[in-house]
Amino acid sequence: MSLFEKHKDVLARAIEALHARTFFAAFPEHPSPAVYGETADADGQAQFKARLGKRFEALKQANPDGWVGEEESPYLQEPLNIQYPSFTVDHLVSSSRQAFNTWRKVGVDDRAGILLEALSRIKDRFFEIAYATMHTTGQGYMMAFQASGPHAADRALEAIAAGYEELQRFPNHAVWDKPMGKFNIQLSKEWRAVPKGVSVVIGCSTFPTWNSITGVFGSLITGNPVIMKPHPGAILPIAIVVAEIQSVLADNKLDPHTCQLAVDTADAMITKTLVEHPDVRLIDFTGNSLFGSYLESLPGKTVFTEKTGVNSVILDSVDDIDKVMANLAFALSLYSGQMCTAPQNFYIPSAGVKTPQGMISFDEVARKLADQINGLVDNPKAGPFVLGAVQSKKTTERVKEAETRGAKVILKSRTFDNPMFKNARVATPMLLEADASRKELFSQELFGPIALLIKTKDTDQSIALAKEMALSHGAISCGAYTTDAAVREKIADEMALAATPVSFNLTGGIYMNQNAAFSDFHVTGGNPAGNASFTNPEYVTRRFTWVGHREPAKV
């Protein structure tokens, strides 16, 4: 049985899910022993620990120039001391170009089968990847398992499904028969989906697998070789993924350099040299807007970016203010505000928020939000696991600097005790108050656990400001609370014009931070927060070109 035959059913279900946009998950998100095996968690933790202080030798990339690695656990604030093979840019690109000549000629069914097999093997590494993610990013255990494991794999499957379908859109061959009166002109025509070439995927430090895997699999399914360039602070999770892809390639007598890992250090980064190489044709990037905009400006490259944005919450009217504040407190606290979809700017009318019991004043809304944050943080069974740890020292410095920005401090950021990791780098959410006239205080992303409560004249001004921020600075998510159908429609319409998806009236166990593969488009590509979207047709069709040949038909 071919790998395509082995996995074709899940591919068919994934393609169906792309169109239905209802719930679909091929990889169970709960780390249950009943699903993954009684010893899966312990085995994964042991596998992770066995890598510490050693060379990562699972890759099939021979003859490195050296071995480098500088990852540090945000929980232990100690180096992992894992060393990865490093290569020159010319070597990486040359190896990729050589692999391209073989990979592009592999049929789409076989490509899909190989990539689906890789995902099935990656599934067996979910727990090892989870611990690797925890100790490079600072994510809590559950998020690390879900985001880097099943949720990332579902996004990869989504890219495979989208690419596979687009590559089937047109026939490979057709006979063109044009009547000309007493005779016909007949041409035999063929069409080829031609991959663009070497693809570079640039990872980030907070979601090294989830944010990168869609680009990796999107390029591979469309016939392009991939060079995965992770952030120097978060290599291990995606290194495991690349190793599994290489293993499947080698098992099927294909060049493992079809997917390579390209590591560097903060003091000797290779990213610019790599992306500026004339043979690099495709670039996927997650990170800051300055570097993302530079990548978008490079001539002759097809670039897919997710950059920074200013995410808003519009508070107009609610049924239950306490449930709303509990939901928003969790959204703010989740992974200490280090998600690209985390809320930052909360627009609240100066008169307050309407409820069935009457108006809740601005100050009372602020107090309730602060109380909910404190209640979550101080809950030893929830706080440490929800907040996790802070990935970068720069983020903790940004939190300290935020107190000096000139806004009123409603709730100070503080540390807390993590019972499992006494030396964890932690910070609780900070709440600042600003008037709507002080745009300089809230017109940029403040990455980390920082939120601003902005006092507006009314909901119309709240909507206008949220739209302005999205159009000018980008936005990936928006939350809105209103019980008024007309207000809801106005928010939906105005934010749609700013290419920003809105989550309305969320309470309970669903949050504006979250996106579901096969249903939610992650980033729209329509505002400055990024030019691409997980996973619409354009995300894969821009990775190849349709080319047609024709000749007289043989009668």
Enumerate the predicted regions with their spans.
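C-terminal segments
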Residues: M1-N63, L92, A144, S148-P171, ...
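Short helix-loop capping/hinge motifs at secondary-structure junctions, enriched
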Residues: D320-V324, G352-G358, S437-L441
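Residue-level signal for inorganic ion chemistry
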Residues: R111, G223, C259, I283, ...
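Short, structured beta/alpha segment
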Residues: M1-H135, T456, S462-A464, M469
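Short, flexible/disordered intra-domain loops and linkers
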Residues: P237, V353-E364
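Long amphipathic alpha-helix in the N-terminal Rossmann-like dinucleotide-binding domain
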Residues: A46, D90-S94, T102, A112-F127, ...
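Rossmann-like NAD(P) dinucleotide-binding subdomain of oxidoreductase/dehydrogenase enzymes
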Residues: L167-M325
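Short, well-ordered beta-strand elements within core beta-sheets of diverse protein domains
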Residues: P79-Y84, S96-K105, G181, I314-L315, ...
